[in-house]
Amino acid sequence: MDSDEGYNYEFDDEEEECSEDSGEEETADDTLELGEVELVDPVVAGGERDDCGETGGSGLGPGQDEEDYRFEVLTAEQILQHMVECIREVNEVIQNPATITRILLSHFNWDKEKLMERYFDGNLDKLFSECHVINPSKKSRTRLMNTRSSAQDMPCQICYLNYPNSYFTGLECGHKFCMQCWGDYLTTKIIEEGMGQTISCPAHSCDILVDDNTVMRLITDSKVKLKYQHLITNSFVECNRLLKWCPAPDCHHVVKVQYPDAKPVRCKCGRQFCFNCGENWHDPVKCKWLRKWIKKCDDDSETSNWIAANTKECPKCHVTIEKDGGCNHMVCRNQNCKAEFCWVCLGPWEPHGSAWYNCNRYNEDDAKAARDAQERSRAALQRYLFYCNRYMNHMQSLRFEHKLYAQVKQKMEEMQQHNMSWIEVQFLKKAVDVLCQCRSTLMFTYVFAFYLKKNNQSIIFENNQADLENATEVLSGYLERDISQDSLQDIKQKVQDKYRYCESRRRVLLQHVHEGYDKDLWEYIED
């Protein structure tokens, strides 16, 4: 390419008009067009609109400097420019139309080196065939179906309605259809099927892909164009290990890092998440165990544990039975079974006597094994509920703590009316920030503890956890109750002392956990 104009993404409105088709083959344009569509740069979650990439560091890891993990927040427009730059770099070597190069790069998951290697291995026909495009260096051997004059109507092979020849268009494969059918076909593929880079020619058994210029020329709805643009850019982001979409709803920003790692990044919308897994930042638990925990909470594994802990199987027909009374004399309600057995030992009821319960098989090995299995299930359920309840409690408290900002703002305004400067009252906002950080950390410590085997280091961890939890509750009490009762100086002294202590204990806890990671001190329970 001779100039940057060949990579212009803006769509020329004049190209929307149907041009006269003289019957000659359509030639590929060098311009890669993804539409003159307004890209949404939303303001969500209290974020500020900014047209420039935002850079920053996490600054949240224990003992880490903010420069340790650098990242940049990009808008959708900037992602498009990254795509353009990638295509430009490749086309400086292979000299193909930009739309064709985009399809080639998509086929190789935007791996420029891999594309270059295949491109110069000497078998271009095979490469273009695998990528489902016509080699632009060769003229199509299939003549477009223009045997009739432009004045004569011809039937569309999709809707079978007659239109002038000028109302038809097609790809290099030679298949032509009317403009209306093309538009409907592309809209269905994009909106209903969510297809972007893999839309093929609508002709039967034709796998030639539709290029970006054709899509943008034949679609008139700006919403469909925007959706197509998002699908193309999403493919670019998903294939790039240094890019990650912000997981916040309706946020169109992308975070770019210098190297991929399980580190915290913060989008301009305010969402902080783990770059590795995309979940909310979850220090100190690792991504592997958080995924297992989320799956455990979402699936029916604990329902199965409850069934195992609170029901038993009939020893004869194996139907599940729940005890609904105090008597241990059980009668199976299965009409084809009617077995009578003892709830305690699962043995036949007849040897137990008819006058009073007398379980003479209580110590039998098979009965003991059955009871042990039930006890294990009950213990597993109780253990899960112990950690899950505390995890959910801190999650709920964290939601409530966010409401404190409004209350604190009001108190800060009151303090400023009592001869305190704006800077002097910032300790309240800082305290709420620390409180929310501690809640989040404590929430994920229970996930970490659930999979942690007991040893000397785990005891130290639990002591640190208990200390931080106690300090966090005290700080929360100061902010929720004492903030409206005590004198201004008393409030400031108590709150500052406590949030600094919370910061210190949180740092100690995280440093201990990460030290355990570094020295391989932790042993885990494989669930």
Curated annotation (Swiss-Prot):
Residues 75-123 are annotated as: UBA-like. This is E3 ubiquitin-protein ligase arih1. Zn(2+) 3 binds at C246, C251, C267, C269. The active site is at C327. GO terms for molecular function: ubiquitin conjugating enzyme binding; ubiquitin protein ligase activity; ubiquitin-protein transferase activity; zinc ion binding. Autoinhibited by the ariadne domain, which masks the second RING-type zinc finger that contains the active site and inhibits the E3 activity. Inhibition is relieved upon binding to neddylated cullin-RING ubiquitin ligase complexes, which activate the E3 ligase activity of ARIH1. A zinc finger (RING-type) spans 156-206, 314-345. Pfam families: Ariadne, IBR, IBR_1, UBA_ARI1.
